[in-house]
Structures are given as C-alpha cells and as structure tokens.
Amino acid sequence: MTFIVLQATSFAQVFVAVLFLIIFCSLLIYKFPQYWHLIAIFLGVVITLCFINQRINELKIGEPIRIYSDQVKVSDNFFYGEGKLEKNKVLISGTANKSFEKELNKYHAIYLVNYKAKVETIMPATNPGEFDYQKYYRSKKIRKRVKLESYQIYPRQITIFDWVHMLRKFLMDYFEKMPQYTRFFASEMVLAQNPSADNKALLNSYRDLGIIHLLSISGLHVSLYILGIMWLGTMMKRTEEEVILCCVAFLIIEILLSNFQAGFVRASLSYFWSVFFNRKKIMISSGDKLGIVVLSHLIFNPLLFLNSGAILSYLLVFGLEISKNFGKIKQNIVLNSLVTPILLNNFYRINFYRINFLTVVYNFLIVPIFNFILLPLTFIVVFSFWCLPAIVKLSEPIFKGLADLTNFIADKQWGLVTFGQIDWLQTIFLLVVTVFLIILPKHKILKLKLRSIIVGAYVSMFFLIHFPLKGQVSFIDVGQGDSILITTPLNRKTYLIDTGGKLNFGKKKREPQLNLITLPFLYAQGIDHLDGVFLSHQDADHIGDLKALLDQIPVKKLYFARGLTENQSFMKKINGHLKDVQLVPLLAGDRVKTKDLSFDVVYPFKPGLGKNEDSLSLTFKLANKRWLFTGDLGREGEKEILNHYHLQVDYFKLGHHGSKTSSDPDFLKQLNPQLVFISSGRNNRFGHPHQETLKTLKDLSIPYLNTQDSGTITWNYSPFRGETITTFYKGNTK
C-alpha cells in the first residue's frame, strides 16, 4: 500500500503493487475468514493513513521554528539538521552565532523567530545510481529545506516533550568522551546513529563484507537488553510482572532514544506482542506474530517501507522465519539470497550495487564475535563508563583490533563483485522465486528448476549489464564541473573525461563528491575499472576528485596535456599511484587509438601548466557522429583550433560551462553542431551559463541541453535502435 500511494510512478508499478495487495488480502481472508471485517477495516485505516501522510501541508513562513539540540549539528560556524515549523518537519541550515551555540548547549529546545529564510524543495537524485534524498526524507515526512539568512532566538520553558531530546543530546555528549571505536559502537547500539565521519571507512568495510545489518539495522541488540534486565531482575529477586514492566519501559525509552529506528522498533514490537500473547495464553505461530508486528508497525508508521533500513530489517527476520529449521550455513545462504536483490536496487544508501560472494563465510565468522564479544562489551561500557571511565582502556583495544581486522579483510576485496543495478521488476521477480524455492516442500525436480531459474536470471542480468548492447556519452551532473563518461557496446571500453570536484573551504575535509555521484553512477552500470581518464586541466571542478577516483577504482591510463606533470598540485593528486597507472602526455596532432574508438587531440599546441588556456581538447567519432570537448578553453584557443583544423561536429560540449569567455560565434558557426551540451551547477556563483552565450546559441539556432536543468544527459547508440538522448532529471527523451 505504501508503494502504491507513495512510490509507484508508472502503470506497471501500480498494477504489480495492486496485484500483490489482492493476493495478500486473499491469503488473510482464506486463513482467517471469521475476521474478514477486521481485515477490511485495517486496509481502510492503512489507505487513509497513507493518503494523510502523502498530503503536503503549506509552510507558514514566519511562524517559529522549533529546534532540538540532538537534531542539529554545528561545524565551521554553520548549523544544519532538522527542525519543526508548526506541524511540518523541515531541513534547516544557517550561520551558527555564539548565542545559538550557547542555547544549543543547554540541551533544551530553542525557537527561532523574526527570521529571514529561503525555502526550497529537497532535490531528488539527478544522476542514475545516485541515492535519492528526496525519497529518503519523504520517509521522515520532510519535504522542504529552510535556509536561514538571519534569525532571533526566543527562550522558552522546558516541556515534558523536551526530556527525550535532552537525554539524547546528553548521551551524544556522553559518548563523545569515549575513544573513537568505543564511541562508534555505543552510538550505533543506543542511538542508532554514527556520530563521526571518522568511521566512514569502517562502515564501508561492513558494507563490502555484506555484514552491515549487524549494526543497528537488524535490532539484534534488543535481545541483549532484555536478557540483561531479566538477569538483573532475577538477581534482585523481582517478580516476573515487575521484570516485564521494566523491559517494556526500557524498550519504550530506547525506541525514543533511537529516534524510532526501524530495526529497533521492529524488535521491540516483537517482544511486546510475545508478552501479550503469553500473558493471554494465546497460541500463535511465529510467522503470524511477525505479520502482526509488520501490520502494527505500519499503522504506527505508514511510510515505513520507504525506509531502506526497515526493508532490510524485516527481510532478514522473514528469512530467519522461513529458514528456522535449516542449519546455520544454509540459513546464512537463505538470508543473503533474500537481501541480494535489495542491495542491487537503489533502495540502499550505502551499498552501490556491489555484492560479496563470501558474505556467508564472513557472517559465519563475524556474527559470533559480534554477538558474544562486541554487543556485551558495548553494553557493559555504556552503563559503566560514567563511574569507571578507565574501562575504555580495556574496550578500545578490543574494538580497534576487530575494526582493523574488518578493514584489512575488506581492503583485500575477497569475493567482492561490482554487479550493477537491477530494476524494480527484476528485484520482485528474484525475491518471489527465492521465497518459493525456500518454502516449497522437498520436491527435488521443482526445486532444481527454481534454482536454475534463479541462477539463470542472475547470470543473464550480469551479462546484460557488463556486456551492454549500446554505447553512451553521458554528461554526469556533478554540479559546477565536468565529468563525462564514454563507453562502447558489447566488449565495453570505458573512458572518463574529467572527474568533477569541489573546492573545500571549511576546516574539515568533506567526503569527495565523486563518492556520492560518480562512483554510484559507474557501479550501477557494473563498471569497476576505467580504460582511460582524460584530464582537461588542473581546476578543482574538473579534476578535484582525481585522487579519490584513483584510490577507489583501477584506471589503466591517464591522458593529459603535456606540461601538466610540472604542476605540483597535480602531482600530489597522483602520487602513490604512479606504479598503477600509465601517464600519457598529449599535444595537438596526437591520437589515442583503440579497437573501437579513436581520440584526436586538437589542442593545446604547446606544453603548459594546466591553466584554462592549456585545456586538452578532444574530438572523436561514435556511430558516425562527431564529438568535440574543449574543457575550459577560451576564445583565443578556439580561434587557434579554427586556424589549424576545419572541424564540423554533430555534438559539442560548450566550453567553460557556458561562460561568455568561450563559445566564440565564429567558432560555433564553423562547428555547426546539431546540439550542444552545457555542464553547470544550479545557482552557481559564476552565473553560468552566461546570457551572452545563450543569446549566441539562439542567434545561431543551436539547441542546447544543460545538466543544470536536466541532470545527467545521456546519448545512447546501438546497432539495433539507433541513437537516443535521455535526460535523467526530467525523465524525458528528446
């Protein structure tokens, strides 16, 4: 129902979702015919709640904005996080003055009044493979971003609703005093959040090994809390009722502290219902109990399954339920078979379309360590650090040692395969067939057929992704910068022109933009290496993420204009990779020739240090279409190209993001392109593309597409279907 109301974007998706809903309701009525009226009422409630949550309330700018100290972060005199404007949750950001930080450190809620603000709709993903933050925040009932330019702080008295947020903030500061790895596990287990970017490498390691669910996603630690309280109650000779009440009260508090994290709520609801059925002496199967947990969770949160963590948490528990009679190894295989289709779709924010075929082995080895060492030790540290701070001298070496071991194994990439992205229909097909394979009786012939179907499906999908029938030229939307992917069909060759990147003006290093945009874009297509990367010039918006690229994906050759190696800034980016990648300096007249594609260099004519006027300029032909790329080359350079080459092209990437310093009218007249492309950022401070350039295009009747408006722009060609141009953001074909 959540999918029908909130996620389905095509008739096919609505049809499949309705079909599953009908089957689900039919099974419920078949099993519980006497309760058909209750089932109908439940469906009515869920439908109503879904539509209520879909409704958008109008923001009343000017009303006070309420901010809780545990929901915002301050960095480099800048704050960002979540706030509430009347009944609407919003993302907020602004400059953090001294009075703001002072009030924030008091833990209680603060009100912002008399403010000036700019309200924006949260942008959806504008690149294939990119995580969609618009959908993510919609699952948290957040649709708007409020950028504060000025504000005043209005003091208010503490209310009962403030206490949970105050306790969360207190625990955040409490954990902040712990060493890095102890802090990491304590925050994940209690608050269901990672407090620091310093632990990004460890999270990536858990992801690559396929054991990310061991953290807060699965809610495994709830059973440890319950066992701890029961043991304490037994030691204190409390009655069963008193122990149950303590468990329920503790779990409710922890649900609030975890900010209603789906895995924790799921595990807690399971305990609540178990207690209820036991006290009422109602016999119910574990499968039916899981169904009741799901339904009650959905009533509580109709947007539940917009959350990837919720999908994985329930899928894991469902897998445990249908494989409860299997051995440990076979059960691990079942769990990974169910989770894999989800991880290859774009539901999951940190997976990037890669799977590890040794995940079963890693789970078999690491789960016992996690359950019997990490979880109990975290539990002990959390509750004893306040009175025995020296305990971290014991815990930190253990946590660090296990983290180092995890990072070491992950760095080896044993079993890790970049599979690529599958679509929603393929995901459903794989899940359904896998479930039937698991739950059907032992019909050997039927099971053999189902196994063959699953294996055949995965193999077919893999080959279609890795040996595509079409090639492409894709202008990746990296904001104010350039990054263009070029691939050939079948025995695919992959080339990148520039990497994109941003200047870092803050004190702290930010995660490279490449990790959020370019790598997911590549991995979604199953691209795990690049045959060559062409570097136009030294600017950060063109090659700022080069080091991050070389650190994470194999590159065979780096092509650049001769003289760039004399630039120390450039050499810093490639130091440490000189043994792994071949450097190829180029000048006008040089040719980079491969079996399927040849790049001709038309600029520069002399070595330089990589300034705009030294931009490497390339032309090549794909499917009888001539392309030209000139980096940030100015008009003087364009005239030099005119003087040496009589170029006419079909497609041209406009120089310098559409700046008036490039795109000379005479140059464009000579090129006579049927379409030009502009790569520029939204609301960029340079005003690109300049109106003068757009007027030139209009005067010459040259149409254009801009990543600023269209997101990633992809030109595809195929021997079977000809050529097409698609724009990802608008989703249309031109």
Tell where the protein language model's regions lie, with residue ranges:
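N-terminal leader/targeting segments
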Residues: 1-61, 173, 266, 443-446, ...
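Hydrophobic alpha-helical transmembrane segments in multi-pass membrane proteins
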Residues: 12-15, 25, 32-39, 202-360, ...
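Membrane-interface helix/helix-cap signal primarily in integral membrane proteins
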Residues: 45-213, 516-525, 529, 563-566, ...
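Short hydrophobic/aromatic residue motifs in ordered secondary structure
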Residues: 80, 123-125, 221, 262, ...
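Non-globular, low-confidence helical/coil segments that flank catalytic cores
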Residues: 109, 113-116, 159, 200, ...
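Aromatic-rich juxtamembrane segments at the membrane interface
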Residues: 143-270, 275-276, 532, 599, ...
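Hydrophobic alpha-helical transmembrane segments
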Residues: 157-166, 184-197, 256-263, 281-288, ...
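Alpha-helical transmembrane segments of multi-pass integral membrane proteins
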Residues: 321-419, 674-679
